[in-house]
């Protein structure tokens, strides 16, 4: 059971009908609406590694804000700060 659980992320986020990049952006939107700080940074980093542009990341943040309201808006500042630290904005 433990091995199957450990393998889950690599299976879920690999390219399928949806590209891994899109899945990571979806994960970012979910993390923003749930306020999971570590997840927000992790999903942002992984999406960038898979070729997401800064504009795609920020558009994902906008979608999350439309769903999660002020909580997602507040958490979006973490993404902007992270992108700034990477010299991307």
Task: Show where each model-derived region lies.
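Amphipathic alpha-helical segments within well-ordered protein domains
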Residues: 9-10, 27, 44-48, 62
